[in-house]
């Protein structure tokens, strides 16, 4: 648990500033500001295989991720990431105290995440270096021991109805409204693949305010977890691109490149 404190140069932080403020005057106050951010390989992969933790970010882009966490009220991952990575879901940026830590959000429709007192996120709470997670689930009967452990650390379950009984998923606008109702006005969506791809689907991608991607100079090869949302169809039923970024900025960070942008309007 001796995680190194990180620093991020103000000169680089300034380049990210335009993508960290609200950009749409018609944004409903019931929805938080949403930043989609993740690290990807040159072949759009997040990891070598499902359930396999894969480090992609170099030291400078890793520090950038923690700077971004310091600028958001919450960070969101799916249950697969929580199980595979045992993530800390905190901000290690120098000078960030407990009150400035982002709230972890774990999307776990069927309560698959069997966290324990030794889970890293809860260890960090006890060390005063992070906050306990809010777990979004459709299962209204969590084990009493899990619930007690979570609430002991300051976390809780947030209950939400499924979008579909077959997909076992939530509608993104419902999730974001539930998050905003907890007083969280901005959120980073960090992964994993199912979470990212579902957010980029046509019915939900309009909810994204900014996109900040780290591109690592490596190919992971076939069989990895990839970011590849469904294609859209044009007026004649022809396939058209799923989404495109506009207002882009490219920022070299060590051997990585960071791409910032906003989703172009879909017509």
Write out the residue ranges for each language-model feature:
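Enzymes that bind and transform nitrogen-containing heteroaromatic metabolites
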Residues: 1-267
């Amino acid at each position: 648990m001796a995680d190194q404190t990180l620093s991020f140069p103000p000169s680089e932080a300034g380049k990210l500033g335009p993508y960290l403020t609200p950009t749409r005057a018609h944004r409903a106050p019931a929805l938080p500001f949403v930043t989609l951010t993740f690290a990807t390989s040159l072949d759009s992969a997040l990891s070598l295989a499902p359930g396999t933790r894969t480090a992609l970010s170099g030291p400078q882009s890793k520090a950038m991720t923690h700077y971004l966490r310091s600028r958001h009220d919450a960070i969101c991952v799916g249950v697969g990431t929580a199980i595979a990575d045992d993530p800390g879901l905190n901000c290690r940026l120098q000078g960030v105290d407990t009150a400035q830590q982002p709230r972890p959000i774990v999307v776990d429709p069927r309560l698959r995440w069997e966290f324990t007192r030794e889970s890293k996120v809860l260890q960090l709470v006890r060390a005063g270096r992070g906050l306990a997670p809010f777990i979004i689930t459709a299962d209204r009967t969590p084990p009493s021991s899990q619930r007690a452990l979570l609430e002991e650390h300051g976390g809780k379950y947030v209950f939400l109805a499924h979008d579909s009984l077959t997909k076992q998923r939530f509608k993104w606008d419902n999730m974001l409204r539930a998050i905003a109702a907890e007083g969280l006005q901005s959120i980073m969506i960090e992964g994993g693949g199912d979470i990212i791809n579902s957010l980029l689907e046509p019915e939900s991608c309009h909810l994204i305010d900014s996109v900040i991607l780290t591109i690592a100079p490596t190919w992971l090869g076939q069989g990895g977890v990839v970011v590849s949302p469904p294609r859209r169809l044009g007026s004649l039923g022809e396939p058209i691109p799923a989404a495109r970024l506009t207002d882009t900025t490219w920022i070299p960070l060590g051997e990585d490149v960071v791409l910032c942008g906003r989703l172009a309007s879909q017509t």
